[in-house]
Every structure is written in structure tokens, then in C-alpha cells.
Amino acid sequence: MNYPKLPSFRLDGKRALVTGAGRGIGMGASIALAESGANVTLVSRTEKELKDLTDHINSQGFKASYQVLDVNNEDEVSSFINNAEPFDILINNAGTNRPAKLIDTKIEDFDYVMSLNVRSV
């Protein structure tokens, strides 16, 4: 079966920011944006993952940089925003979960999950 192909999707000259970029959906989105021509800034709490992904993207001839950042930390986020150049694209992908039944979840864990998944966006 033949499917129609979409025209080439280009983001040349655009600046993109991806939170939670170190793995999973964030990693995939970062690679796709870079392959489409965007200059991608990767954000996560884990420097090794960010460095490895940045090196991978740049080694393919695309543009990426990274910033270690906890999007749940207001001071870190404010500092980052105040020092960053404007972005054209924002992918708020940072998120987490605590694998437990809600009835068994500690309030501290619940608050952390809600803060990261809702407020950080």
C-alpha cells in the first residue's frame, strides 16, 4: 500500500528548547527537531544523558547544546530564562511518576509528581 508523503518539514534557523530531553520522547523530539534544521537546546537534570545526546546530534552535522536544569526549581528556571536567547519552539516534555497505587502514595511523592508534571509546564 502506498501512502502519500508529506512535504519536507524544515525548521532551518529556528531555535527549539526541549525539556526532559535526556531520554524517551524528549530524546526523540530533540533528534527530530535537529534533523529538521532547528538549533536545539536540550534540558534535563542528568548531564551525562544530555552530553551524550548533544554529541550524537552534533556528530551528525546538526546543531545542539544543553543545559543541566531542574524544571521544578524556580530559581534555576528563572536564571535560565533570563540568560537564554528567545526560542521559537518549546517542547515541555519533563515529567515523572511514582509507581504506586494512589492510596499507597505518600503526600510528598504526590506533590512532587504534580509539581513536575503540571507546574513545570
Protein language model regions, located:
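Flexible N-terminal pre-Rossmann segment of NAD(P)-dependent oxidoreductases
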Residues: 1-14
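The beta1-alpha1 cofactor-binding region of Rossmann-like NAD(H)/NADP(H)-dependent oxidoreductases
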Residues: 48, 67-79, 107
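Conserved glycine-rich cofactor-binding loop
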Residues: 15, 22-24
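Conserved catalytic-site loops of classical short-chain dehydrogenases/reductases
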Residues: 88-89, 111
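Substrate-binding pocket helix/loop in short-chain dehydrogenase/reductase
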Residues: 101-102, 109-112
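Conserved glycine-rich Rossmann-like NAD(P)H-binding loop of the short-chain dehydrogenase/reductase
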Residues: 38-52
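Conserved NAD(P)H cofactor-binding loop of Rossmann-fold oxidoreductase domains
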Residues: 94-98
